[in-house]
Amino acid sequence: MFFATLSCSKDNDEPEIPVEIPEEVPEVEDPQLKSLTFLSYDNPMQLTTDVKGEIIGDSIVEFWIPNITSDKLLIPKAEYVGESIKIDDVPSTIGSTKHDFKKPVILTIANGDKTKDYTIYVHSFTGLPVMWIETEGRKDITSKEVYQRASFKLVEDVRTRAAGDIIEDSVSIKGRGNSTWGMAKKPYALKFDKKVSLLGEPKDKSWVLLNNYADKTMLRIKTAFFLGEISNLEYTARSHFVELILNGRYNGTYQLCEKLKIGKDRVNVGDDGYLFEIDARVTGESDSRYFTVNHLANSVDIKDPDVEYGDEKYNFAKELVTVADSVLYSANFLDPNEGWQKYFDIDSFADWYLINEITHNTDSRMSLSCYMNYKKGGKLKMGPLWDFDIAFGNTDYAQRGPEGFWVIYANWIYRMFADPAFVAKVKERFNYFYSKRDDIMREINANANYLKYAVQENENRWHTFYTYTWPNYDIWGSYNNEVQSMKEWLNARFEWLKGEFDKM
C-alpha cells in the first residue's frame, strides 16, 4: 500500500492530511501446462530424437516414444504457468529431475493457492499399428467357446492420429488355439457385428490374433505365408503385426490375421464348397463335423459350412473324401482318367507339400492344422497354409535339423510320390522356390527390421529370450541371434533338399 497527501487551500492554514490508499493486488493466474517434452539431450540412453507430448483436453498428456527402452526413467522439460511443479507429489526441477513413467503419473502445477493436475501417459511406440481392446468390466478372457463383448480401437499411425487411420467399433472376443491357448501370452479370436476392413484388407467379420509366443523371431508364420503368396496356392491368409493393449495393459506384439473361412475374399469356393481341416479331434468335441477315412490317422473336420451329422452336406463331404482316399490307394491309382488325379489337384498338393517340407513343419504330416478345400465340380485342393510357429527347426520333440525328409512321410503325400508325374511336379516346383531364396531372405530381413523395436517391448512384457519356451530346442539369448539361427537353418535346409530332389 502507499500513502497520498490531501491538502486544502493555503488560506485556511489547515495541515495536510495523509490518506491510506490500498495497493491493487494482481490476480493469480490459473496454473497451466503449455508443453511437456522429453529431450534426447537430457535422455541420451533412451531417446534418439526429441518427443513432445500431446495435450488432450485440459488434463491428459500422451507420449509415444519412437524407440523402445528397457525402462522409462526420463527427464521431462516443461513450459508452464505457475510457481512450482510436482510429479506424483515429488517436487521436480524440470529439466534435471528423472522420473519413472512406466505407469501413468500425475503432474501437478501450483500457482499461489491454485493447483492443476495432468495425467501423463508414456507409451512405447514401435512403428506398428496399435490395437486397444477393453472387455466389459475388464473381465479376463478365459474361454475358447464363449465370446465376450468389448470395445475395439485400431490406430494405424499413432504419431499423426489422422482421421482415416483410426477404427473404433464394438467386437466380441474369445480365446483360440490348441497348445497356444495354454501359453502365458494368449491368442484370441475376434468377431465383429458387421464386416470391417482392418489395415486395408478386405472386409469380414472374423479375424484372429496369433500370439507367436513359441516363436521368438515372430517371423515363422509370416515367412511361410510369404512362400504361400509366391506359390500356386489360390489363397494365403493376409496378416499384419500389431501391438495389443488389452484392458489397459500392454499385452505384446501380435499377428492380426484373417480367419480361415469360406468367403469371396477368403477361401473362395462358392456357396456349395467346403473347407476341411485334417486335425486331431479335441476330446469332448461333437461328432457333427467329423468323419474318418481309411488312410488318414486323424479325423477330417468340416470347418465350413456348418453341417449336422448325417445331413446332406455332411454325407456329400464324407463320400467325396472317402472315394478320393480309396482311389489314391487303389491298384489303378496311376490311371490318367480314373486315378488319383481325378480327385486331387496336383498343383496345390505339390506346392503345399513343398512349403511344409522346406519349413519342416512339425504339424504337417496330415496330423494337425492341415487345410484342404473343395469347389463343387472341381478337385480336392490343399490349403490354405496354417500354423508354422514351431516350424523351421523350432521344436525339441521331433526331428528338427535342416537335414532329413519329414512331410514326405505323410500318408497321402507318400503315396503320391509313387507317381512319377507327382515327383516331376515336385522337382519343378522346388527349383522355383529354390530360385526365390534371395527374395525369401530379403522378406525375413525386412520383417525383422520392422519388428526391431516391437520385439524389445514384447520381451519386456514376456521375458522369453533367456528362458526355455516350449517347445524350443535352443535358447539364443537375443532377437538377432534368433533370426540369424532361423536364416542359417533355412539356407541349410534348401541346400539339403536340393541335393535330395536332384537325385530323384
Feature map (PLM): residue ranges:
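C-terminal motif of bacterial Sec signal peptides marking the signal peptidase cleavage site
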Residues: A4-S7
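Regulatory N- and C-terminal appendages and interdomain linkers associated
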Residues: S9-N43, I106-T108, I120-S170, R442, ...
